[in-house]
Amino acid sequence: MSNSVPLLCFWSLCYCFAAGSPVPFGPEGRLEDKLHKPKATQTEVKPSVRFNLRTSKDPEHEGCYLSVGHSQPLEDCSFNMTAKTFFIIHGWTMSGIFENWLHKLVSALHTREKDANVVVVDWLPLAHQLYTDAVNNTRVVGHSIARMLDWLQEKDDFSLGNVHLIGYSLGAHVAGYAGNFVKGTVGRITGLDPAGPMFEGADIHKRLSPDDADFVDVLHTYTRSFGLSIGIQMPVGHIDIYPNGGDFQPGCGLNDVLGSIAYGTITEVVKCEHERAVHLFVDSLVNQDKPSFAFQCTDSNRFKKGICLSCRKNRCNSIGYNAKKMRNKRNSKMYLKTRAGMPFRVYHYQMKIHVFSYKNMGEIEPTFYVTLYGTNADSQTLPLEIVERIEQNATNTFLVYTEEDLGDLLKIQLTWEGASQSWYNLWKEFRSYLSQPRNPGRELNIRRIRVKSGETQRKLTFCTEDPENTSISPGRELWFRKCRDGWRMKNETSPTVELP
C-alpha cells in the first residue's frame, strides 16, 4: 500500500454515503454483493494486468513480460517449468508505483530459491483508484491470474503444486480469487495482512479462504478491535498468525503514533504496521538460521498469560516462508512476540509462579520484574505483565521473552517494584491499602518458579537460594537457582517443527 493508507477509510465511508447506504460498513459488517461485481464499463475495457517475470535481483532489471498464448517470452527468459513459481501480488495504491517492499521480496525469493520463477503481477492501473473501485477490480485480476495458470498448465512438466501466490493487503484477496478460479488446486497462498474493509465478515467465496489453495497461511499485523481495521481481523487461512497480537507492532508503537501526528506523518506509522507482515516474510527468507515460531492459542490474552507455549499436536509452527503445511487445520489462530527489526526472532518463556501468603491481604496489584541469567547471556530486566490480577495461594502464569539466546538458564532474579511517584502507582497503592486496612504490611511468599522455553520445549524448576527466606515485599527481591532436580525434558511427542 502507499503512504496514503489511512485515506482508505475516508474513501470507503464516502462511497457508502454516496451510494445511499444508511450505515457505513464496520469491522463486522456484511459485504454487499454489488461491491464485488465489476462495473459494466469494466467489461468493455481490457483489464490492465501484466505478468513480469523477474530474472534478476536488480530492481532496475525489467525482466520479461508474459502473456497467455505467447510462448516465446518463456524461452527468452528461461522459465523453469519444473521449479517453484512465485506470483507476488501487490495491493491498493494511491501513488500508482511499486513500493520498496516489492523489490526486497523479489530479491529475497531469488536468494532463497535460486532456480525459482518469480513473477510480479502488475495491476497498478486497476489498483490506482478509489479503494472501493480497486476492491471491485480484485475479481477481474484474480481471473487474469487464473487464466495465466491454466495456460501454463498446458505446458509439459508445469505443476500447480509448485505455485505459491503471495498477496499483500488487497492482493491477498486477489490471490484467493485466483486460487478459486483456476482449474485445479494451487500449492500455497500466503496472505500478508489481507485487507479488512469490505472483506471483514464476508462470505467465504468473496475473500481469501482455506479453500483457495492446498495450504493457506496468513500473517495479520494491522488489526484493531475498535473502529475500522486496515487488516482483516478474522482468520481466513489454515493457519492465521498474529505477531504481537496482530495490532501494535514494535517500532510502530503509540509513542511513534503521537510523534507522527505532531509532525504530520501519521501515514508512515500506519504503513509501518500494515507492511510489517511483508518484512516478517522477507525475514523468514533471508534469516533462515533464525526462524520465528508461533504458538496456537484461542486469543491474545491467553497468549499474554503464557498459557500457550506447547508444540504438542501441531500447536506450534514456523512463520513466513518456513511454515509447515497443516492441511488438517482451518482458521487456527497462532501468536508470537517479535523484535522491532530484522531478525525478528525472540525467545519465549512461560513462567509459573506459585504465590502464597500467610496473611489475608485482600486483592493486591504488585509490579514484578525478572532478570534471567543464562550460559550465553543475561537478559535485561523484564516486566511480568499481569493480564488480569495476581491470585494468592495459586499458581500464576506469565509470558516473558528475550531478544537474545540466553542458552541454558542458571538463575532468576525476581523484583517487586517499590512505590513510585506516578499517579497510576499511587492509585494502586491506595487501592491496595483500602483492600487490607488491618494488614498494612504487604508480603508474599514464593518458593519455586517453573520455566518452560517455547523454542526448545525444555522445562526447568528454580528454587529460592535460601530455603528459609521465601518472602518478598515492595522494593525487595528474591533470587532463584536451578533446583537439584530442576532440569527435566517434557515427556511428550516431538515438536512438529524443526526447532534449533
UniProtKB/Swiss-Prot annotation:
Secretion signal, residue range per the UniProt entry: 1-20
Disulfide bonds: 64-77, 252-272, 297-316, 308-311, 463-483
Binding site for heparin: 325-337
Activity modulation comment: Inhibited by serum and NaCl.
Biological processes, Gene Ontology terms: cholesterol homeostasis; fatty acid biosynthetic process; high-density lipoprotein particle remodeling; lipid metabolic process; phospholipid catabolic process; phospholipid homeostasis; positive regulation of cholesterol transport; positive regulation of high-density lipoprotein particle clearance
Glycan-bearing residues: 80, 136, 393, 469, 491
Active site: 169, 193, 274
Keywords assigned: Disulfide bond, Glycoprotein, Heparin-binding, Hydrolase, Lipid degradation, Lipid metabolism, Secreted, Signal
Tissue/organ expression: High level of expression in the liver, placenta, lung, thyroid, kidney, testis and in the corpus luteum of the ovary. Expressed also in coronary artery endothelial cells, umbilical vein endothelial cells and in hepatocytes and osteosarcoma cell lines. Not detected in heart, brain and muscle.
Cited InterPro entries: AB_hydrolase_fold, Lipase, Lipase_LIPH, Lipase_N, Lipo_Lipase, PLAT/LH2_dom, PLAT/LH2_dom_sf, TAG_lipase
Domain of life the protein comes from: Eukaryota
Keyword hit for Protease: no
GO CC aspect terms: cell surface; early endosome; extracellular region; extracellular space; Golgi apparatus
Catalytic activity: a triacylglycerol + H2O = a diacylglycerol + a fatty acid + H(+); a 1,2-diacyl-sn-glycero-3-phosphocholine + H2O = a 2-acyl-sn-glycero-3-phosphocholine + a fatty acid + H(+); 1,2,3-tri-(9Z-octadecenoyl)-glycerol + H2O = di-(9Z)-octadecenoylglycerol + (9Z)-octadecenoate + H(+); 1,2,3-tributanoylglycerol + H2O = dibutanoylglycerol + butanoate + H(+)
Major localisation: secreted
Membrane-spanning segments: none
One MF annotation (Gene Ontology) recorded for this entry: heparin binding
Compartments it resides in: Secreted
Miscellaneous information on this protein: It is termed endothelial lipase due to the fact that it is synthesized in endothelial cells, a characteristic that distinguishes it from other members of the family. However, this protein is also expressed in other cell types.
Described function: Exerts both phospholipase and triglyceride lipase activities. More active as a phospholipase than a triglyceride lipase. Hydrolyzes triglycerides, both with short-chain fatty acyl groups (tributyrin) and long-chain fatty acyl groups (triolein) with similar levels of activity toward both types of substrates. Hydrolyzes high density lipoproteins (HDL) more efficiently than other lipoproteins.
Subunit: Head to tail homodimer.
Entry similarity comment: Belongs to the AB hydrolase superfamily. Lipase family.
Name of the protein in its database record: Endothelial lipase
